[in-house]
């Protein structure tokens, strides 16, 4: 039995979970998320109000989807109650971020500014011109947008310049030895 998959999912007060066949919909104070559960996995509500994810057999596919499904539903419950946020920072001379409405405009050493549009469900918050955050209720979407922004100018291993996650340690390389 999957150690993660067999754990019950506690549903806090103010969160409504609807199970309609293979579709699981979670509504909370911050919004609504839905997920379609893969074929061999089933989700049931227990008497004490928690959710239990079960699998019919010990096939390899069932075992792999068991823990995954439980974690995805747990992330949905946490997302609609607390939400998710990724903090990023920019290091480098002349590198900065400015808010343009709901979008972000980056100056990252290119000959042109780079504009990142906020998709539905994602909000950007700019602390100062080198620190900002990506927030939303969908953990996967928040992480993907943050990774795409980081990919605009990955941290340089020699000088450390670029966009990085807050608190990320960049592995530095030694430059070539001069004579």
From Swiss-Prot:
SUPFAM superfamilies, alphabetically? Ribosomal protein L6 (SSF56053)
Please name the InterPro entries in this protein's record. Answer: Ribosomal_uL6-like (IPR000702), Ribosomal_uL6-like_a/b-dom_sf (IPR036789), Ribosomal_uL6_a/b-dom (IPR020040), Ribosomal_uL6_bac-type (IPR019906), Ribosomal_uL6_CS (IPR002358)
UniProt keyword annotation of Transport present: no
Pfam families, A to Z:
Ribosomal_L6
List keywords of the entry alphabetically. Answer: Ribonucleoprotein, Ribosomal protein, RNA-binding, rRNA-binding
A Gene Ontology annotation in the biological process aspect, one of them, is: cytoplasmic translation
Provide GO CC annotations from the record: cytosolic large ribosomal subunit
Q: How does it assemble?
A: Part of the 50S ribosomal subunit.
In which family does this protein belong, per the annotation? Answer: Belongs to the universal ribosomal protein uL6 family.
Q: What does it do?
A: This protein binds to the 23S rRNA, and is important in its secondary structure. It is located near the subunit interface in the base of the L7/L12 stalk, and near the tRNA binding site of the peptidyltransferase center.
What protein is this chain from? Large ribosomal subunit protein uL6
Q: Which species is this UniProt entry from?
A: Kineococcus radiotolerans (strain ATCC BAA-149 / DSM 14245 / SRS30216)
Q: What is the lineage of its organism?
A: Bacteria, Bacillati, Actinomycetota, Actinomycetes, Kineosporiales
């Amino acid at each position: 039995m999957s150690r993660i998959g067999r754990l019950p999912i506690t549903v806090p007060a103010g969160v409504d979970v609807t199970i309609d066949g293979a579709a699981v919909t979670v509504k909370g104070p911050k919004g609504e998320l839905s997920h379609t559960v893969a074929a061999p996995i089933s989700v049931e509500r227990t008497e004490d109000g928690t959710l239990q994810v079960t699998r019919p057999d010990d096939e390899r596919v069932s075992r792999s989807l068991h823990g995954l499904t439980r974690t995805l539903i747990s992330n949905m419950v946490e997302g609609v109650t607390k939400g998710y946020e990724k903090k990023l920072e920019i290091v480098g001379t002349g590198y900065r971020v400015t808010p343009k409405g709901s979008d972000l405009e980056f100056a990252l050493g290119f000959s042109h500014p780079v504009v990142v549009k906020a998709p539905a469900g994602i909000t950007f918050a700019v602390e100062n011109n080198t620190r900002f955050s990506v927030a939303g209720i969908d953990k996967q979407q928040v992480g993907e947008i943050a990774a795409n922004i980081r990919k605009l100018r990955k941290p340089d291993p020699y000088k450390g310049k670029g966009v990085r996650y807050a608190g990320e340690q960049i592995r530095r390389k030694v430059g070539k030895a001069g004579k």
